[in-house]
Regions:
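Conformationally flexible catalytic loops at phosphate/diphosphate-handling active centers
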Residues: 5, 132, 153-238
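Glycine-rich, anion-gripping cofactor-binding loops and their flanking helix/strand elements
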Residues: 66, 70, 81-82, 88, ...
C-alpha cells in the first residue's frame, strides 16, 4: 500500500490514466465530493486533451456518455458526486451491460470510515450496480500500478465498469492556478499495464483521432468494433436445409456476409448494421405470418433481435435447427433455449439453391409495393386502404425518414413504434454505402434516447448529418437531455418526434383489445397533451410542427445548425387496424407471388 494521496493528486492520476487509455470524452454531473475530479477535467479540457460535457442531471449524463461511446467506439467516462447521484446512472449502466458498451463510471465517494455512520450523502455506493458493472473501490492509498491497471481494465472491458473513488481531506487543490490542476503524464512509455498499452496503440492508430483521417466505418461500411466474432475457422454449415438469417441489433456485417455467401434470405432489423444488399428483406417479419414461415428448416441468429413476436417465435421453435452466435456481451439471443450456441459466425463453402431465396424475395417485393400503394391511396381516399385514416400515417412518416438517411448519415431510432415502423418501411440500402443506424435495443427501453442521440451526434462529427426518430413519450421521457448549458459542445442534430399524444404501441398488443377499452386510455395510452413547442422554447431549441410529408422531406434535406425538433402530429386511433391491414397484405403478396411462380 502506498502513502495516501491528497484528493487532488488522486483525481489527477485517475484522469491521466483515462487519457492514456484513449478516453477523450468525459461527462460530468457537478457536485461537491467530486470537486477534485471536476477541476482536473476542466483544466484538461482547456488544454485540449479531453472534451468535457457538463450536465446537471446524472441520468441524462449517463445516457449522453452511452451515446458518445456508441458513436465514437471509444471508452467514455461519466463522473458523479456521491449519494443518489450514482443511483441515477443505473438505467444507462444496464443498457451498456446488455450491449457491451465501454462505459466507465467514476463515482466520487466519502472515505470508508464514514460508511454506515449516517454521515451526510454517504451510502454503500461501491458495487451499487451489482451484476451490471464490475467495481473497483479506489482508496487514497492505492498504488500507481494498481490504479493504472484498474483504469486500463475498465477502458478495455466490453461493458460498464464502476471506479468508485474515495476522496478524503481537502477537496480543493492548494494552488488556485488552473495550470497546476492538469498535465499530461510524464512517463507515457511506462504507464499502465498491457491492456492499457493495447488501448493506447488502438487510439493512436485510429484514423478518427486525427484531424484528417476518415471514419473507417463510413469509408468501408464495416464496423471497426465487430459485435460478433468473425473467423475463417467458423463452423461450415451444410447446404440443403431451408435457412434464414436473422440479424438483430448490432449484428454487424457478419450477418450480411453469411447471407450473401449462402444465398439465403435475411431478416435484418434496422439497427442490425446488416440491412444492406439484395439478401435483406424489407418486410421479413410480416412474411413470417404467412405460409413461408412453415417452410423454414434452419435459422441462424446473429445479434439481438427484439422487434417482433413472429421473429421471437421463429428463433424459439424447438422443431427447427436454431444456431445463435454470441454477441459482444458474450450472450447469444436464445429466448426459447433451443439454440446451439456458437462463438463465431458460421460459414458456407458454396451458395445454396436460389429458388428458396427467390420465393422470399418475390413476396417481399410484392408486399412492399402493396404497402406503398395502399399508403399513397389512403392519403386521398381512406376507403382504398381499409382501416387507415386520412392524414399523416406513421408508416408514411417512417418512409420519409428512411429516405432521408443518405450515405454517411447517422440515424438514432427510439424504441416502441418508431423502430418497428422503420422496420416495415425502410428498404435495404445499397452495398458500399454506410449508414450508422442505432438505438438502445439492449433492454429496448424508451429512457435516455434524447441524451443518447446527442451523444452519438457528438461522437460522430464527420457524419453527413444525424437524425433521431422517436415517439412523443420517448421524447418527453428524456426531455432533460435538451438541457445543454452555455458553452457546452452542441451537435447538429434533427429530432423527428412522432406525436400521437400517448403510447400507441399498446393498442397493437393484448391490452389494446376493445374489451379493455374502459381502462386503456388511462393506464396504457396515457395521453399527456404537452405543448412540445413550449417545451423546446424553454430549452432554447428550434421547433417546427410539420403536417405535410413533402415539407418533412424538405426539412430533412436541410443542414441545420444546432439541435432542432420536427414535431409530426399523427393519430393513434388506427394502429390496431393498421396492423391487421399489414397482415392481410402479406397474405395477398404471398398468394400473388405463388400464383406467378406456378404460371411461369
Amino acid at each position: 500500500m502506498s502513502a495516501a494521496r491528497t484528493a487532488s493528486e488522486l483525481a489527477l492520476r485517475i484522469v491521466q490514466s483515462l487519457w492514456l487509455c484513449g478516453v477523450r470524452d468525459i461527462v460530468l454531473a457537478p457536485g461537491s465530493r467530486s470537486a477534485p475530479l471536476a477541476l482536473t477535467l476542466d483544466a484538461a479540457d482547456r488544454a485540449g486533451d479531453v472534451r468535457l460535457h457538463v450536465r446537471v442531471d446524472e441520468r441524462s449524463a449517463a445516457f449522453l456518455a452511452l451515446g458518445l461511446t456508441t458513436g465514437s467506439r471509444r471508452p467514455v467516462a461519466v463522473v458523479t458526486t456521491s449519494g443518489t447521484a450514482v443511483g441515477n446512472l443505473l438505467p444507462a449502466v444496464m443498457e451498456a451491460h446488455h450491449t457491451g458498451r465501454r462505459l466507465v463510471v467514476v463515482s466520487a465517494d466519502r472515505p470508508d470510515r464514514l460508511r454506515g455512520t449516517g454521515a451526510n450523502q454517504t451510502t454503500q455506493q461501491a458495487g451499487l450496480f451489482g451484476v451490471f458493472a464490475e467495481c473497483d473501490d479506489l482508496t487514497p492509498e492505492v498504488s500507481d500500478a494498481e490504479l493504472d491497471a484498474d483504469v486500463a481494465r475498465a477502458c478495455s472491458r466490453r461493458g460498464p465498469t464502476q471506479l468508485n473513488v474515495q476522496l478524503d481531506g481537502d477537496l480543493l487543490p492548494p494552488d488556485p492556478d488552473p495550470a497546476a490542476w492538469w498535465h499530461r503524464p510524464d512517463d507515457l512509455e511506462h504507464r499502465n499495464d498491457s491492456a492499457g498499452a493495447e488501448l493506447r496503440a488502438e487510439a493512436e492508430s485510429d484514423p478518427r483521432s486525427t484531424s484528417t483521417g476518415a471514419d473507417p466505418a463510413s469509408a468501408s461500411g464495416v464496423d471497426v468494433e465487430p459485435s460478433v466474432s468473425i473467423s475463417t475457422d467458423g463452423e461450415v454449415l451444410p447446404l440443403g436445409p431451408r435457412t434464414v438469417v436473422v440479424a438483430g441489433d448490432d449484428a454487424g456485417p457478419a450477418a450480411r456476409m453469411l447471407a450473401e455467401a449462402a444465398g439465403w434470405p435475411m431478416l435484418a432489423e434496422p439497427t442490425s448494421g446488416a440491412r444492406i444488399g439484395r439478401q435483406a428483406l424489407r418486410t421479413g417479419r410480416l412474411l413470417l405470418t404467412t405460409d413461408l414461415r412453415g417452410r423454414i428448416e434452419r435459422v441462424v441468429v446473429i445479434g439481438h433481435p427484439t422487434l417482433s413476436r413472429p421473429v421471437t417465435s421463429l428463433i424459439s421453435d424447438p422443431s427447427l435447427e436454431v444456431l445463435a452466435v454470441r454477441g459482444r456481451d458474450g450472450v447469444a439471443t436464445d429466448p426459447g433455449r433451443v439454440a446451439r450456441v456458437l462463438d463465431v459466425v458460421p460459414r458456407v463453402e458454396a451458395a445454396d439453391d436460389p429458388t428458396w431465396f427467390d420465393s422470399w424475395h418475390d413476396a417481399d417485393v410484392r408486399l412492399s409495393a402493396l404497402i406503398d400503394a395502399g399508403l399513397a391511396a389512403a392519403q386521398g381516399d381512406p376507403q382504398r386502404a381499409p382501416g387507415l385514416d386520412v392524414g399523416l400515417s406513421p408508416l408514411s412518416v417512417a418512409a420519409v425518414v428512411a429516405s432521408a438517411v443518405e450515405a454517411d448519415t447517422s440515424l438514432v431510432v427510439g424504441s416502441s413504434n418508431a423502430v418497428r415502423d422503420l422496420d416495415v418501411m425502410g428498404s435495404p440500402w445499397p452495398p458500399l454505402q454506410h449508414r450508422f443506424v442505432v438505438g438502445n435495443r439492449g433492454l429496448a427501453g424508451i429512457d435516455g434516447t434524447v441524451s443518447t442521440a446527442i451523444g452519438i451526434a457528438l461522437g460522430r462529427p464527420r457524419a453527413a448529418r444525424t437524425i433521431a426518430y422517436l415517439g412523443d413519450l420517448t421524447f418527453l421521457h428524456d426531455s432533460n437531455g435538451l438541457l445543454v448549458g452555455s458553452g457546452q459542445p452542441r451537435p447538429d442534430l434533427t429530432f423527428v418526434v412522432l406525436n400521437d399524444d400517448g403510447g400507441a404501441i399498446f393498442s397493437t398488443l393484448e391490452q389494446g383489445d376493445p374489451r379493455y377499452s374502459s381502462a386503456f386510455e388511462r393506464v396504457f395510452a396515457t395521453p399527456h397533451g404537452t405543448d412540445l413547442a413550449a417545451l423546446c422554447a424553454a430549452h432554447h431549441t428550434a421547433h417546427e410542427r410539420v403536417e405535410d410529408l413533402d415539407r418533412l422531406a424538405r426539412a430533412l434535406a436541410e443542414s441545420p445548425t444546432g439541435i432542432r425538433v420536427l414535431e409530426v402530429p399523427v393519430s393513434r386511433a388506427d394502429r390496431r387496424a393498421e396492423a391487421a391491414w399489414l397482415r392481410s397484405l402479406a397474405q395477398q403478396a404471398l398468394s400473388r407471388a405463388t400464383g406467378d411462380a406456378e404460371r411461369s
